[in-house]
């Protein structure tokens, strides 16, 4: 459905092509806003009649680990996840915005571009915290030394926000550097390891992989120095149709994510073993090393203002036209899950309360 919609315009942007400019990115977003009117993949179904299958997209970083564990360990009662494979990072959000999938773990920045374009979607929980990392080639040890250099990242991503804010903190801007956009996480990591970019902002475990593979490379920022601890990266978002028609399914998924967070906190090695290779295209050792650097945090109600503040960056970069408000969040199902599962919630290490 989505591919057919995109290909109606011979000059449009097919799923396999990643736009390299903001103009192309925004044209893709406009296309998706129209596709959203076609409806979602979710079909109403009584959970008592059998497991409800939700089509989903996900990212490639450790912020997605609880989402992966929900699927691999069958943690959601009455709900199963059907992951839809995407050819590029941009298409992870694209399919969600177009209504091809019901739910997604997505960078909050990508969510805001879809929301601004009119997609009927809501943030209902968090997924991962921290884990955005700026790494540089040997000899580059400060923001000032990035002047005139090439930084690799992804469009309208949290991985574009960090270098934007990192440079701003140093009195610089994107005008002082060359920004190069990539299509997939492995592609960006390999470009850095091969020395084809001077620096990159990447997600864990790919940042750790690159630092290990490129002798002498330097971590310039892990985001904590810019934003503080436990800043948001990815969020759990759902189509409004699903939220309205099967709230219990959304709650079951949120609870399962909390169970996954607890399991990950108790045994990171086991969580990595169940997800590396299939989801993380890095070595077991690099992934385990990185696991604690981007922990799961499902209750991110405390990050609402942080997320909204980043919207100004997206507007300045012309990804969105209007600043969103708190209405793009619906914490109701999360609040109910917490109230109904106080023992589980009390065992979580990272949370808002």
Language model regions located:
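N-terminal secretory signal peptides
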Residues: 1-24, 31, 36
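Conserved C-terminal helix/tail region of periplasmic/extracytoplasmic solute-binding proteins
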Residues: 315-353
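Short, glycine-/small- and polar/acidic-enriched structural segments
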Residues: 49-191, 198-204, 219-221, 229-230
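Pocket-lining segment of extracytoplasmic ligand-binding domains
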Residues: 109-110, 186-278
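Cleavable N-terminal signal peptides
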Residues: 35, 46-47
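Secondary-structure end/capping motifs
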Residues: 244-322
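Short, solvent-exposed loop/beta-turn-alpha elements that line the ligand-binding surface or hinge
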Residues: 77-78, 224-229, 296-302
């Amino acid at each position: 459905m989505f591919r057919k919609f995109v290909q109606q315009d011979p000059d449009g942007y097919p799923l396999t092509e990643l736009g390299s400019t903001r103009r192309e990115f925004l044209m893709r977003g406009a296309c998706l806003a129209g596709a959203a009117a076609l409806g979602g993949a979710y079909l109403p179904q009584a959970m008592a009649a059998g497991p409800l299958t939700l089509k989903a997209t996900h990212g490639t970083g450790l912020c997605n680990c609880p989402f992966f564990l929900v699927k691999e360990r069958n943690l959601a009662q009455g709900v199963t996840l059907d992951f839809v494979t995407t050819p590029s990072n941009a298409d992870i959000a694209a399919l969600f915005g177009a209504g091809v999938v019901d739910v997604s773990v997505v960078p909050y920045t990508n969510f805001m571009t879809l929301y601004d374009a009119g997609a009927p979607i809501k943030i209902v929980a968090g997924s991962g915290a921290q884990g955005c990392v700026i790494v540089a080639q040997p000899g580059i040890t400060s923001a000032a030394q990035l002047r005139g250099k090439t930084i690799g990242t992804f469009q309208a991503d949290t991985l574009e926000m960090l270098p934007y804010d990192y440079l701003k903190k140093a009195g610089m801007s994107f005008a002082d550097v060359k920004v190069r956009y990539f299509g997939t996480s492995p592609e960006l990591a390999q470009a850095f390891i091969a020395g084809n970019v001077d620096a990159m902002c990447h997600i864990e475990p790919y940042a750790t992989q690159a630092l290990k593979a490129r002798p002498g490379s330097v971590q310039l920022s892990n985001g904590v120095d810019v934003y503080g601890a436990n800043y948001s990266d990815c969020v759990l978002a759902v189509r409004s149709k699903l939220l309205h028609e099967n709230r219990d399914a959304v709650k079951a998924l949120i609870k399962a994510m909390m169970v996954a967070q607890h399991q990950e906190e108790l045994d990171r090695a086991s969580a990595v073993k169940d997800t590396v290779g299939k989801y993380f295209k890095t070595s077991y050792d690099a992934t385990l090393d990185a696991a604690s650097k981007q922990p799961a945090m499902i209750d991110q109600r405390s990050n609402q203002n942080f997320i909204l503040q980043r919207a100004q960056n997206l507007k300045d970069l012309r990804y969105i036209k209007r600043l969103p408000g708190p209405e793009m969040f619906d914490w109701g199902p999360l609040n109910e899950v917490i109230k109904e599962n106080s023992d589980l919630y009390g065992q979580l290490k990272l949370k808002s309360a």
